[in-house]
Swiss-Prot record:
Effect listed in the UniProt record for changing residue 18 to A: Decreased ability to promote phosphorylation of 'Ser-5' of the C-terminal heptapeptide repeat domain (CTD) of the largest RNA polymerase II subunit Polr2A. Does not affect dosage compensation in males
Modification sites for Phosphoserine: 18, 238, 433, 492, 496, 585, 682, 684, 749, 764-765, 810, 879, 889, 1025
Modified residues (Phosphothreonine): 434, 659, 747, 750-751, 753, 788, 813, 832, 1014
Coiled-coil parts of chain: none
Residues of the signal peptide: none
Gene Ontology molecular functions: chromatin binding; DNA binding; protein-macromolecule adaptor activity; transcription cis-regulatory region binding
Subunit structure: Component of the male-specific lethal (MSL) histone acetyltransferase complex, composed of mof, mle, msl-1, msl-2 and msl-3 proteins, as well as roX1 and roX2 non-coding RNAs. Interacts (via PEHE domain) with mof (via HAT domain) and msl-3 (via MRG domain); both interactions are direct. Interacts with tamo via the nuclear localization signal. Component of a maternal MSL subcomplex composed of mof, msl-1 and msl-3.
Region (Disordered) residue spans: 1-44, 171-199, 244-266, 358-454, 485-691, 729-799, 1011-1039
GO cellular component, one term: MSL complex
Species whose genome carries this gene: Drosophila melanogaster (Fruit fly)
Gene symbol of the encoding locus: msl-1
SMART domains (UniProt xref): PEHE (SM01300)
Protein name in the entry: Protein male-specific lethal-1
Amino acid sequence: MDKRFKWPPKKRANYLESPYPHIPSRGRQRNLHGHPNQTQHLHQHPGKIYERQQYGNGRGGHGGGNNNYRKLLHSLPAEHGGGAMAPPSSGGTVCAGADMVKLISENNNLRRMVMLNLNLMQEQTDSIAAKDKELDDQSAKMSVVKAQNEELKQAVAQLEAANQELCKQLRRKNQRRNDNDDDDDDPPLPPAAPQQKLIRCHAETQTVFREREQGTQTIDAQPQFANALPRGINMKESPALDHHAGAVTNQPASKRSESKGRGEFNGKKVSTFILQRMNQDFEHHIHEQTEVAEEHEMEAHKEQISQEEDQLVAEEDHLHMQEVHTEEVVGGDIFHDALESIEMEVVTEELVDMEEHGQSVDANGHIEEDDDEDDEDDENSDKDDDSEEDDYPWMHSDADVNARTEEELWQNQNYLLELDPTEEKTCAPSAHSTPNHQQKSSTQAEIRKEGNQNRITEKLLQLKPEPMVDALEAPILPKWVAFKKKDKEHESVPESPEVPKQQPHQEDAIVDHNAIKNQLEVPKPDLKPKDQPKDEQRQDGQLDVRVEPQEDVRKVQKETLKRQPEDAPKHLPKAVAPKVTKTSSRESTLPKANTADIKDAPAQKVIANHQSTKTQTDPVKTQRLQVKIRQYEMHPDMRTGSSAPSDIRKQKNVDPVSTPETKTIKSKSMLVNDKKTTSETSQSPDQEIDVETVRRKLAEHLKKELLSQSHSSQVTLKKIRERVATNLIYPPPSAPVSSTTITPAPTPSTTPTPGSTPQHAVTSSMDQEISAAKSKSKAAEQIATPLTPQSNSSVSSTTSTIRKTLNNCSPHTYSKATARSGKLQSRFRTATFPYSTRTWEDQEFHCDNEFFLEEADELLADNPSLEIPKWRDVPVPPSSDKIDTELLSDATFERRHQKYVKDEVDRKCRDARYMKEQIRLEQLRMRRNQDEVLVALDPLRASTFYPLPEDIEAIQFVNEVTVQAFGENVVNMEARDDFGVPWVDAIEAPTSIARSKALAEPVATLASKKIPTTAAEARHQENHSSYVFPKRRKRQKNR
């Protein structure tokens, strides 16, 4: 018992020496102020323990109920004055006892709760300790792994140092080897100077050289017989092309350069996978004049080096980046190491990033993303564009090259993007130019893979200027300014929509362009543009246009005019006019505009062909737009036309702001290839726009681009003329498919709407108004048909009839309608699915609760009017008596039905035992009554209806299998018109009974289900199932 309920052992005042000394010490002095007729003895029953009653009397139903034994010390001084508590009431004893019991029970409950809480806290403490132990184990493992990682890093550092030392030794040996090796054909090189010329080359020109570099890595000093090799080895020059400073991609490689490691160019670290794809298409051809003895010496040299190559393979696998010192230009040696290894200069991380995400302009002025290039581009990987560098005036200053600001870097990148799409150039090898390795900041270029990994990666290569460039430097500057001004005039003048007018302007542009090229006197070899996807070439009629005479241009125009729809004779096709004039940097780097020509009146709205390209979510693109705004501030005299030509196949996103503006266009100017072509006669001075308007429109466009990032991508429904030939919906709808018939009902601006077949057709403002009106009138009538697989399945599902299949056939096999259609006119019945005549094998698979489900189905099918118990809720007021309320608990239900269940199980056990006894008695009776002893016969041989394997004569693969019964083919009676079985097909059944029989499934019984169960399981299933034995019960005789 708790210490609180123990009596105090200390004696107090008025303590009586009695057998029960604890009674006078309670809070209530019972006999001092009791009733006059009450007995004055302390204990009416001296031998009885008053522990519980006296404890409860201290809190009796009188005024001093709060004076319990805890108040004892404070109430002692009042005892001498006759007591400080009122006498108890007559009924205080019973209530006090009840309160005492309640208090003890509550105390016990509290103790129990405390123990439960303690146990719970102990369990939680144990679980936390276990988790701490697990975390300690994990931390120990992590420390072991970190230690191993540090060891691996040290090993990698050692291997890297060893590899660098080997590379330095081999580089020094190659330098000594090439000191005496010189070609007298090449003119002497000027001293090394900072690079001032940027050319673009593919990054796929290093792989072969790197592989050959591994073959020449050696540690020991090799004989110097390799110096005798002429420079013609491994070199192939393009004979038909001139050499000039701007074309250097396939340099002659007379020796194997080991100066650069796998991931290092000019001290710059570049991602390894770029370098692995370099030099793929470089052709190595041994010169025909090489002597046979020298070739044998080279083979012997390779055999010696292959032994040490195996040692360096393991080292180079661990090295992702290497730093190699900058090569010095060897005096008198024009074939420098950097020339063979094709040193590449990564300007900054931003420039590489921009070029990776930049957009290439094809021959028809459409923008293609880098991830759309196929593997077909690999065949052009050794050719690229380097003809634009002659037009940059700032490249002739060394200080500007070394100290570029961010804006100048963006300008440089933007000028590199302005390609002449009609010129096809190839980069000829230049043997008399030595690249100077200019040291930049050691920022590692992060090349990102987008889409196809086989796309062409372009880098910036810097070359030292040559004497020819110095000679042409003075005349280039004024001509470059004049040429750019003429480009600005061309791009800002709209073109009239007539076909005959455009061709003379294009011819003038070609003549002017060719004249400027001749004046610059810098030969520009052909560059094959990046191959476009084949589907786009088929749809758009785009052609690979080369810089050819004017007759070829006219041929291209005639061919593309034939490919356009006949109902649009007054519109020019998109592939008619290849852009010949170079676009300025402002034009090539404009944001993907939704606006028409900026020089037109402000009332001119957005032209629908100028759609926004993919929503720009890259922050680098936002930075690009900001740089363009600064460029417009720096060059106020630049006048821009609408640029960023859109590829309709790619660009189906339109800004939410510019979507409603396409309906109110009043301009009559037409776009050709989404650009304004040259028309000098229609130029007027009042169309010029000031810098503020350009700045304002650029700010609006930047706001639109930022706003479009928060919205989902939208698809523009282009209003194209009806073309019944192409259809994206299968099965095709009844009406001819066009853009207007597919146009759904008006949807929110953020929901993508399905677009029709992309067709590169020029859409003017008048056509847009007409098509928009047509789409508005038909939008209410047409039902939106989304181009999704769900729509196809939903359309087809509405036409199919729902029908239950039979046991072992599909609906169309035994259907009479199929037989009438003539598809099953063979002599024997056939099936188009794997048919099995062993039907008993198909009954081995069952689902859970299959018997009960089948029983329920049979009950519902046999008697649809079967009464099912129903109930309803009857609200019972709280004051009502609960005598008549039925208990619905599971325990009550089981207790109520346990007797019946037990009786049924006992009955079935008796029945099973009785049946076994009867069988045993029948066997004994037959044994006693038999006349002769039965002789065991041999078992019958098991045979089959199927042909034996040795009787097979041929094997035939067919789509339909013959249906057999007992080894014979079943005759197809449904092929005959005079025969029909109504109960086979529910559709042909004339009566409801026949239809129900046709649709009925076989009854599942325990005997028909061959379930592999044990004897105990089978007996339990039989005893506890709802099936009854089909036996006649005998009434037990009462004895």
